[in-house]
Structures are given as structure tokens and as C-alpha cells.
Amino acid sequence: MSGAESFVPAPMYLTDAAAQRLGALVEEEGNPGLKLRVYVTGGGCSGFQYGFDFADTVGDEDTIIENGTASMVVDALSYQYLVGSTVDFEEGLAGARFIIKNPNATSTCGCGASFAV
């Protein structure tokens, strides 16, 4: 093999269900500029944990992922752990929540809120 190979990371995805729920939450807040901030921090039973928050500002190093009018923002450090992930919204017996399907996770805890790489 000759020459350098280029690497383009797989993008992140925001499902239609997550986009619809995010749109409803933004409408409830009355601020159409709000975005869902998704981030990774140390902690949880598997080493890293996911976090969700509203953001009305976007940093220079942030990545924006859109689905229709819904937007999610990920900082550069978190993005490296979330490349290729899908953010979804589910409702069930345990309640309603945003979830992350992360192909980079080598293990997850039972509740799905923390992971290891």
C-alpha cells in the first residue's frame, strides 16, 4: 500500500424521534435558538457517562448535527468518543429519555447512561 490514507470519521445522527422530542422541548422553553448539547464526562459505573443539556451558544470547536429544525451540539473532546453514534428518544416503563447508541463503547452499564471504550 502506498501513500497516506485519509480518514473521515462517521458523523453523528439525531433520529426523527429525538428531533421531534427536542423540537417540543425547545417550543416549551420558548427559545427557538436552543440546541441539545450532548457531552461525555468521566464517571458512572463504566468509566464515562453521557450528559444532556440545553445550549443557546455554540463554540468554535463544537460540531452541530441537525435533523429538520432540531439541532444538537457536541464539543470537540466529547465528539471523539461519540463519532458514529446515534442519539434517539425512547419512551417505556422506565420513563422517557434521550439515549445514545454508541458503536465505540466496548461495554455499557445496565441503564445505558455510562460506557467504556
Swiss-Prot record:
GO biological process per UniProt: iron-sulfur cluster assembly
GO MF annotation terms: 2 iron, 2 sulfur cluster binding; 4 iron, 4 sulfur cluster binding; iron ion binding
Binding-site list for iron-sulfur cluster: 45, 109, 111
Origin: domain of life: Bacteria
Cofactor annotation remark: Binds 1 iron-sulfur cluster per subunit.
Keywords: Iron, Iron-sulfur, Metal-binding
Cofactor(s), names only, from the UniProt record: iron-sulfur cluster
Xref: Pfam families: Fe-S_biosyn
Chain's role: Required for insertion of 4Fe-4S clusters for at least IspG.
Known partners and oligomeric status: Homodimer.
Family: Belongs to the HesB/IscA family.
NCBIfam families attached to this UniProt entry: iron-sulfur cluster assembly accessory protein, PRK13623.1
Protein name, per record: Iron-sulfur cluster insertion protein ErpA
Source organism: Chromohalobacter salexigens (strain ATCC BAA-138 / DSM 3043 / CIP 106854 / NCIMB 13768 / 1H11)
